[in-house]
Amino acid sequence: MIKVSIFYANREGSKFDLSYYLKSHIPMVQKKLGASLIGGTVDQGLSSVEPGSRPKFVVMVHLLFDSLEAFQNAFVPHVESFMTDMPNYTDILQPVIQISEVKRLKLPLSTTSNT
């Protein structure tokens, strides 16, 4: 599985309209990517490690695809549409994008306390 992550840095004075992003941009992306998009999340930054500190990223988006080829075939034909819509929700026009291979963690079925 491939995860495409888009990170919008939290710069002083930058704008990000999360409402527009969730109600307009993401549905447009979902429609254009179709069945190739198998899942995803939109994470709104709350803080950094220190209490009361600004988050490093105002928004992080994670889109899941079966393969790199599935992502490229679905995404590349629509890049212009996605980029054209960016000024409608943000002035952060150069987000950081990373493509990762997802490795699943094996979690324990139960936990026990040694107290």
Where are these regions (language model features)?
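Macromolecular interaction modules
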Residues: M1-T115
